[in-house]
Amino acid sequence: MFIVKPSFLSMSGLALILLLTGCQSVSKTTDKVGSWLGVKPSVPEVNAKGMVDLSQTTLNQLEQFNTNMPKNQWVYMKNKTQDVYILQNKSDDQSILSFRFNCQLSTQKPTFYLYNAKGEQILSAYDDKLGQIQFLLDNKNYLNPFNLYSSQKLETFKKELVTAKTIKIYHAGHLYRFENQHAELLNKPVSCQE
């Protein structure tokens, strides 16, 4: 991610901040004036296709969206103003998985990030210090498809992922489980740089 993390905001929420415009002081003032007048700013909603535009979102709206983000499905968050696109999946235990397969910039390589319920990044691709990571699609083990030495494993994984019902990630004695609803969003272009 590109900005410094405020102490009150989780890392997964931080990913969403990337989708904000640079006019935070204006939006905060607008929120204050609106609250004096009894007008509540609406929180962006995910449409039926699993997509949401966060281009005109205030920090307060973004925090509310992050708290209430739909679970057990992929959500494609876009900020057309800043040309930032993020794909995330929130589980029942509040863990968030972010797959970044189709990078907007061809110089970037596909990656993933896994955040715990507190929003702390606990796993990412290509980090040898983390030990063994196993990805399971409908209980079929693909080991770690994000292998620096074999892009073929990743291509096979991506192909199988489109039809899988569940994604499980096993690491250090903990199993993370995600439903794979709106899997068609996995083909969307995303911002791959953290």
Where are these regions (language model features)?
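Bacterial N-terminal signal peptides that target proteins for export
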Residues: 2-12
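A generic "folded-domain core" signal
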Residues: 24-194
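Viral structural modules
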Residues: 14-17
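C-terminal motif of bacterial Sec signal peptides marking the signal peptidase cleavage site
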Residues: 19-22
